[in-house]
Amino acid sequence: MSATVENVEYKDTAIPVVYEHSSYIPIVSMQLVFTDSGHLANTKDGLATLSAKLLGEGTSKDGATKFAKKLDNNAIELNAHTGRETFVIEVSALKEKFDTAMDLLQELLQDPNYTQDALEQIKRQQLGYLAQKQSDYDYIASLNLREILFDNSALARPYDGTPQSIESISLDDIKKFISKHLGYDNLIVVAGGDISDKELQDYTKKIASLLPKVEVKKLASIKVSDKKVTRYITKDTQQAYIYFGAPFDYSYEAKDQYKAKITEFVLGGSGFGSRLMEEIRVKRGLSYGAYCMLRESKEASYLSGYLQTKIATQEEAKAIVQKVVDDFVAKGITAKELQSAKDFLVGSEPLRVESLAQRLHRAFNEFYYNRGLGYSKKQLQDIENATLDEVNEFIKSHKELRDISFAIVTAK
């Protein structure tokens, strides 16, 4: 069966449940997705990340080791992680063990390991991660690009924290974050596998009964800078790491998403055959790869891309990126490029829906972005029927893509 979305009524809230039944393998997986509770909800840099990590430390009664042993003994996976917009708790188990999995999830939600030992453990882990990132020049270039594109906004912040912000986070900060952001009224359940609709409704109500009501906020739109800034960050490196981005004045709710899909594919999303790859690698040999994509989210839409090149050719590569985008916006694409995009995007569709996890992820995105289930299939039809004139009209209307900013990690 294909995925469905149903509402489970609980108190004053209709909890959306994205669901696909599959008895091919006797496994059940469930995601609890809490909206407006990811990195953008941080009151201190890294707070959402540490809050998720703390839920990986078991309960205060059992501690991390004993709780992990309970999970292992029953072959249950239970973890938490954060994205920009959401906080997610995932649980999966064999069907025969899923009741046990739900019981352990209940223990975790009712008794998180709010102890100083657990806090110090997750702080050590995060500080170690941040120390490693000091020599990850892709990370540094990406962070600097976000600072440029989203100046003075939550998107410009270091999501994973800084050593100073991580040290400043207290148990009380984490308690407040979890209690204010993990509620029944900002919950979306995504589930699939060998589980009936009735069982899923019962589990959803059980989980909801463990959660408070929280204040649900709408994500604010963030303006993307069009100032065409170039920032150089000097490090001990033999390569230049070039990250670039520009505004893309386009809503995630727009009805003609297929045009953006084709645009992205031809400009820099397709690897070999894309404009960027052809000009930077194939014709000039300046880099092993050059890519870009059009990112669309509830808070911002923008172009972002990256490449690596020799220090001596960084300015040439930067200039080519600008010229490729300028020419692309001015002239659009060719009939051959359009056909190549159609062939790949339509022809590779089976690979994007072959697993239950892929199908559930797609169904969740269709629901979350208000596109309706089945939107992706309709988009494929729109791609097949797209004309060269309408795609080029779309490309030429987005002159803001030329307002490119660069963050370049280069040698001292």
Model-predicted segments: where are they?
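Short, surface-exposed beta-strand/loop micro-motifs that present aromatic residues
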Residues: P16-H21, K176-S179, K228-T234, F394-I395
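Solvent-exposed, non-transmembrane alpha-helical starts
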Residues: A41-K44, D99-A101, E253-D256, Q314-A317
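Extracellular/periplasmic catalytic domains that process cell-envelope and extracellular macromolecules
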Residues: Y10-K11, S23-P26, H181-G183, K235-T237, ...
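M16/MPP (pitrilysin/insulinase) zinc-metallopeptidase core fold and M16-derived inactive scaffolds
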Residues: Q31-S92, G271-L286
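Charge-rich, well-structured scaffold segments of protease-associated domains
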Residues: K69-E215, K283-R284, G289-K412
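N- or domain-start disorder-to-order transition segments that initiate the globular core
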Residues: S2-I27
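His/Glu-based metal-binding/catalytic segments typifying zinc-dependent metallopeptidases
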Residues: S22-I25, Q31-D36, V216-G273
